Amino acid sequence: MVNVVLGSQWGDEGKGKLVDLLVGKYDIVARCAGGNNAGHTIVVDGVKYDFHMLPSGLVNPNCQNLLGNGVVIHVPSFFKELETLEAKGLKNARSRLFVSSRAHLVFDFHQVTDKLRELELSGRSKDGKNIGTTGKGIGPTYSTKASRSGLRVHHLVNDQPGAWEEFVARYKRLLETRRQRYGDFEYDFEAKLAEYKKLREQLKPFVVDSVVFMHNAIEAKKKILVEGANALMLDIDFGTYPYVTSSNTGIGGVLTGLGIPPRTIDEIYGVVKAYTTRVGEGPFPTEQLNENGEKLQTIGAEFGVTTGRKRRCGWLDLVVLKYSTLINGYTSLNITKLDVLDTFKEIPVGISYSIQGKKLDLFPEDLNILGKVEVEYKVLPGWDQDITKITKYEDLPENAKKYLKYIEDFVGVPVEWVGTGPARESMLHKEIK
């Protein structure tokens, strides 16, 4: 059994909390894409664990965790995150963590060129805006992967005669091509090389053939949960390109990032924030550049876990959610942070786009169009009630249930979980048929 948790908007929907809720039922949690450019916090017994690259399944002492071939790995950050989690009391994490031998490596010079590229792009753009990269080197690493010049985990840990020398030569060549492109930026190659010589020995025990790992688990009928990174609207193909990440963050990325066939997928859980946020630049049709946006930002504590950047806030965009549903095929939804809307008397939701008076049939691929659309809103009544202490779905205010029902009816997917507060137990389950 393979079930998948995916973000349906622009990220930061609260995927980690749902994964945390579910991991007790699973034998394996796997990540399939991205790197340490995303982040979420899980609270267990009053202890906060910040995850960026590593799977959230580490909070379950009986769960194995895999970084698949689609993930890009900055090895120093891998160990730093692991050590930070261990220092907070995470038990036997090292024996439960595995890394695909096919995953690509992120080097520090990828991070340097990430920022240089961002400056270059902002200088070229008409409005001076940049993509809003986290600066973690993710984009440049996927770029070297696509150009077939990147280095993978197996290149680093290979013990065969001459393998280390080949790694050094390829590493140096990769650095030189970056310097040819971006100038002679500061980078101590010899010091980094010495660091990686130590790290390769530390990394070896974690490395597995992830294809064999996954297929053996599937054959053994293990329960597997795939933890998606980022979200559909940041997908390299289906997101608001070019204001996207560099990987496939939808259901397609699950298959290619773990090497599993489509028929192995059972349930696909779409995580949806009860309003909409995004970090960085790019079109955002329902954004509220007013007191409503500020109120959502303040009550929702909308700051990025990885970057600390303030998130842009707006009303729930059902055009986005319907588009996301078409691509990912969600079998049920998790609506998060519903409590943030508690004090709003009226709650608009975006239900259609039009441009120059003409209604659009679907979410547009052209950002020149998307940036000019007018949003039609359906205004729903608020519930003006604190829902953070409610423990059963049935006890939610009627208007809160109507809000959720409107979402269900619009996208044609049932709501199965509802987040009503930051605590681990603040997640209501709704039976679905």
Curated annotation (Swiss-Prot):
Pathway: Purine metabolism; AMP biosynthesis via de novo pathway; AMP from IMP: step 1/2. Inhibited by GMP. Inhibited by chloride. Inhibited in a highly specific manner by the binding of a 44-base DNA oligonucleotide carrying the ARS core consensus sequence. GTP binds at residues 11-17, 39-41, 311, 337-339, 419-421. It holds the Pfam family Adenylsucc_synt. GO terms for biological process: 'de novo' AMP biosynthetic process; IMP metabolic process; purine nucleotide biosynthetic process. PROSITE patterns: ADENYLOSUCCIN_SYN_1, ADENYLOSUCCIN_SYN_2. Optimum temperature is 35 degrees Celsius. Transmembrane segments: none annotated. Present with 56800 molecules/cell in log phase SD medium. NCBIfam families: PRK01117.1 (NF002223), purA (TIGR00184). Homodimer. This is Adenylosuccinate synthetase. It comes from Saccharomyces cerevisiae (strain ATCC 204508 / S288c) (Baker's yeast). The lineage of its organism: Eukaryota, Fungi, Dikarya, Ascomycota, Saccharomycotina.
